[in-house]
Amino acid sequence: MLCLCLYVPVIGEAQTEFQYFESKGLPAELKSIFKLSVFIPSQEFSTYRQWKQKIVQAGDKDLDGQLDFEEFVHYLQDHEKKLRLVFKSLDKKNDGRIDAQEIMQSLRDLGVKISEQQAEKILKSMDKNGTMTIDWNEWRDYHLLHPVENIPEIILYWKHSTIFDVGENLTVPDEFTVEERQTGMWWRHLVAGGGAGAVSRTCTAPLDRLKVLMQVHASRSNNMGIVGGFTQMIREGGARSLWRGNGINVLKIAPESAIKFMAYEQIKRLVGSDQETLRIHERLVAGSLAGAIAQSSIYPMEVLKTRMALRKTGQYSGMLDCARRILAREGVAAFYKGYVPNMLGIIPYAGIDLAVYETLKNAWLQHYAVNSADPGVFVLLACGTMSSTCGQLASYPLALVRTRMQAQASIEGAPEVTMSSLFKHILRTEGAFGLYRGLAPNFMKVIPAVSISYVVYENLKITLGVQSR
């Protein structure tokens, strides 16, 4: 029987030996040879049961709930390979040792800022010989029985754009760990995110349609409110009219997400060279370019969504009929109306959303991440809601101008409305407030959209066989 033990040092007392977990299958004569020990700070002993479960899950190949000797050896070999890769990524100077500056730099690349004192504290916990540097042996010995490395754990728990869908797919794509890519879990995350987005958008579609109506039709002379807007929609087309435009809005999730992810992965290789994870500004550049490529590819669907949301009862028989009529009357160029303000809106939305989310993530990791990088449901929802709200607030004037340009049908002989002329017209006739028409229903849908997409995402993950949070 293979027995792994924890020795928990207590100041002023003898060391106490605690059984960590036992594994059957080791010959009795080898028991003393393969008895392993690991030292942890006494304040961390409360987590040893969680560590036990993680190690068993990581190495249990036959899913019998325990480790035999062969499984344990395989676990050690596989885990040592992963630790070697992480050690090399942290060793910026390639001198075989990690110092405090390299720890700070590696975490800074992920958007996690720590002080030099905090880096030295991390260093001291692993440094056995007092050199204030960590060599490979010290790194391996410290982490060998810890089944989750910090960097992949942060990436795993702090997914953002994959989980949260507020209707504006302009966020920077999430990172995926090496293991998620190798095992194919990344596409399951994307499928779960797409399904969550479909349910979330359908549930909040009435608020989204009201936002579009207020962006296009509300003015000083037509002061459309939330109650008045809903009353007008129901009176004109009944309760079903609240979901006009939702079909195309859901339909565009799959192609947009797939194109954006593939473009992001290709651009990452150009921007980040051979680095596994990108720095924040590199993520912003790569994510914005990927978003621009994805939006350019599916932009005609954005125009169709706006036209379908604004249609009167009986105006179009469906999406294809709407597309045919636009093509016949206005030409191909009509499918790219509002394209320029839409592209310009990517930078402020994606940039501020990413900056706010990373700032909140960094603050939480610094102050509350003691034994795990898992923030829990409410922290994740709060961070996602706040970052999405800030991103939308910054890019909203461009989104409003885009929607008005998409809604404008060409009249023969009439001049084309440009982005700059529309901005000037709104400011002259309605003031700065006019650039924020429809903001109230837009913000009203953020919390339910984020909450619904999270719940559906977590349930779809289980269905698709993705490891639960």
Swiss-Prot record:
Protein's job: Electroneutral antiporter that most probably mediates the transport of adenyl nucleotides through the inner mitochondrial membrane. Originally identified as an ATP-magnesium/inorganic phosphate antiporter, it could have a broader specificity for adenyl nucleotides. By regulating the mitochondrial matrix adenyl nucleotide pool could adapt to changing cellular energetic demands and indirectly regulate adenyl nucleotide-dependent metabolic pathways.
Subcellular locations according to the entry: Mitochondrion inner membrane
Gene: SLC25A25
Topological region Mitochondrial intermembrane: 1-189, 265-287, 358-380, 458-469
Catalytic activity: Mg(2+)(out) + phosphate(in) + ATP(out) = Mg(2+)(in) + phosphate(out) + ATP(in)
All residue ranges annotated as the EF-hand domain in the record: 47-80, 78-113, 114-149
Name the UniProt record assigns to this protein: Mitochondrial adenyl nucleotide antiporter SLC25A25
Alphabetized InterPro entries for the sequence: EF-hand-dom_pair (IPR011992), EF_hand_dom (IPR002048), GDC-like (IPR002167), Mit_carrier (IPR002067), Mitochondrial_sb/sol_carrier (IPR018108), Mt_carrier_dom_sf (IPR023395)
Annotated domain remarks: The regulatory N-terminal domain/NTD, binds calcium in the mitochondrial intermembrane space and regulates the antiporter activity of the transmembrane domain/TMD. In absence of calcium, the apo form of the N-terminal domain is intrinsically disordered and binds to the transmembrane domain, inhibiting the transporter activity. Binding of calcium leads to a major conformational change and abolishes the interaction with the transmembrane domain and the inhibition of the transporter activity. The C-terminal mitochondrial carrier domain/transmembrane domain/TMD bears the transmembrane transporter activity.
Activity regulation remarks: Activated by an increase in cytosolic calcium levels that induce a conformational change of the N-terminal regulatory domain, uncapping the channel and allowing transport.
Domain of life: Eukaryota
Taxonomy of the source species: Eukaryota, Metazoa, Chordata, Craniata, Vertebrata
Positions of transmembrane segments: 190-207, 245-264, 288-301, 338-357, 381-398, 438-457
Tissue: Widely expressed. Expressed in fetal and adult liver, skeletal muscle, testis, ovary, hippocampus and caudate nucleus.
Region: Regulatory N-terminal domain, residue numbers: 1-165
Alphabetic keyword roster: Antiport, Calcium, Membrane, Metal-binding, Mitochondrion, Mitochondrion inner membrane, Repeat, Transmembrane, Transmembrane helix, Transport
Cellular component per GO, a single term: mitochondrion
Gene Ontology terms, MF aspect: ATP transmembrane transporter activity; ATP:phosphate antiporter activity; calcium ion binding
